[in-house]
Amino acid sequence: MSVVVYAPASIGNVSVGFDVLGAAVSPIDGSLLGDRVLVESGSDAFTLATSGRFVDKLPENPQDNIVYDCWKVFARELETKNVTLKPIHMVLEKNMPIGSGLGSSACSIVAALDALNQFHDKPLTEMELLALMGEMEGQISGGIHYDNVAPCYLGGLQLMVEELGIISQEVPCFDEWYWVMAYPGIKVSTAEAREILPSQYRRQDVIAHGRNLAGFIHACYSKQPELAAKMIKDVVAEPYRERLLPNFAQARAYAASAGALTTGISGSGPTLFSICKDKDIAERVSRWLQDNYVQNDEGFVHVCRLDKQGSQVTGSKL
């Protein structure tokens, strides 16, 4: 028996919701922007192989790979439920650049834990699995947060609530929006991008942040796309992080002039996203970003839509 799970890229924060909003995205051309994990029966308790475009960025020792840690916490949870852990062989197909702001670690974590759960006939509930995903994400970034793993796993636009046993709930968004994702090919460490933020904020910034986030959520529920786009402003992180992103200011200015609704930093960067209301504008912005924002052969630009499905079983073979 074997199972393969694909986990899509995600936009942490979506500018307006620092650590509490996240959106899953997939390219409109059908290409896979995310990681895949295979779980199959093995002869040992655990073995791991790696492949994919960004495999050379992974640690050589399998026990230093986050997938190994996912297996360990999954085994811990099965023990509490008196469920037998099967001997397995796992393969991580690493298609996502590390330190990209596209939820790369979340892709590996979600694909690994979802595949492990599927392989063992789903002994863990959705929320139990999501809690483990947040725990693993915290191990990498230094603090538990769900704004990448929740959309990556559940799909769509997710709001982190973390009350009444509910970690995250989906917020209705706009199917007509195109999300242009541009990764320049350089790395920004999440931990470094967090250290650059101030320890305290001015009262007017706190008020602006609350107004923007509340206004955005209201506009999503009341189906006002223009208002929603206007509310996507970041007063918490972007003013401090944009200096880590070469040409970000120019890219944002061009996208606005080309008709994009808004442009922001995806997660902690260096990937940016531009939301466009029609395909022609999205493709125009995409071409400019490919020529002016991408810095090397590892960079790329994709025109995407919201991925409503999140992680999914794609078969039994990579």
Swiss-Prot record:
Q: Does the keyword Nucleotide-binding apply?
A: yes
Q: Where does ATP bind?
A: 97-107
Indicate whether Kinase appears among the record's keywords.
yes
GO CC annotation: cytoplasm
Lineage: superkingdom: Bacteria
**A GO molecular-function annotation:** ATP binding
Query: What pathway does the UniProt record associate with this protein?
Result: Amino-acid biosynthesis; L-threonine biosynthesis; L-threonine from L-aspartate: step 4/5
Q: What Pfam family is a match, any one?
A: GHMP_kinases_N
Q: Which Gene3D superfamilies does the UniProt record give?
A: 3.30.230.10, GHMP kinase, C-terminal domain (3.30.70.890)
InterPro entries per UniProt: GHMP_kinase_C_dom, GHMP_kinase_C_sf, GHMP_kinase_N_dom, GHMP_knse_ATP-bd_CS, Homoserine_kinase, Ribosomal_Su5_D2-typ_SF, Ribsml_uS5_D2-typ_fold_subgr
The membrane spanning regions, by residue number, are: none
Class of enzymatic activity (EC top level): transferase
Kindly list the places in or outside the cell where this protein is found, as annotated in its UniProt entry.
Answer: Cytoplasm
Annotated GO biological process: threonine biosynthetic process
Q: Which family does it belong to?
A: Belongs to the GHMP kinase family. Homoserine kinase subfamily.
Q: Which PANTHER family match?
A: HOMOSERINE KINASE, HOMOSERINE/4-DIPHOSPHOCYTIDYL-2-C-METHYL-D-ERYTHRITOL KINASE
Q: What is this protein called?
A: Homoserine kinase
Report the source organism.
Answer: Aliivibrio salmonicida (strain LFI1238)
List the lineage, top down. Bacteria, Pseudomonadati, Pseudomonadota, Gammaproteobacteria, Vibrionales
